[in-house]
């Protein structure tokens, strides 16, 4: 989900302002609360909105979820994009584009209609990951300090992906950028909790991976036969609860 097109924009003091709709790209008019974005049609059943940051993705996703019209099948956030899947028999691409533009401008209704309700989760974690000492060293703190900061953070599921049930967690309380492993592991055990960039996350199943592993959880992150297979969904909040912390 990443395409780059530059269209008729003016930059003043590093802020994109006074932008217009050109060649089907929805853009920001500089109004307070408005988001700068580009929109691309993805066939006849979806639109892709590109933003400039993860923070804008979270804002746009929340606005869309709070004002979802009939005909929207799914709203899928990612690191810099939001994909809106729709039924064109109920909601045309033109109408969907207008709705997304309204949400981006801050004009869309904040009254939830049939949006899903975000859930709060508390996940047990044992800080026994093989990379925890290395991560503490990289962040110039003690192992105990790393554990304390990770536990203190209130995490939000920004988006899901990579593997079914894998949630990319972000937090305003977490201000660290953790580099990925230089050599990814060919097999990461299910339940492994890791860090990469600004994200934390837990592996729902055994899979290759390059995140720095700091712990493990026994939480049922993905159950294929359940009504809702994935435990975590975008917008949910997560707190980690220490289990078996080594003193």
Residue ranges of model-derived segments:
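Intrinsically disordered, low-complexity repeat/linker tracts enriched for polar/charged residues
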Residues: 5, 10, 15, 20, ...
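Conserved "landmark" site that anchors the functional core of diverse proteins
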Residues: 1-5, 23-247
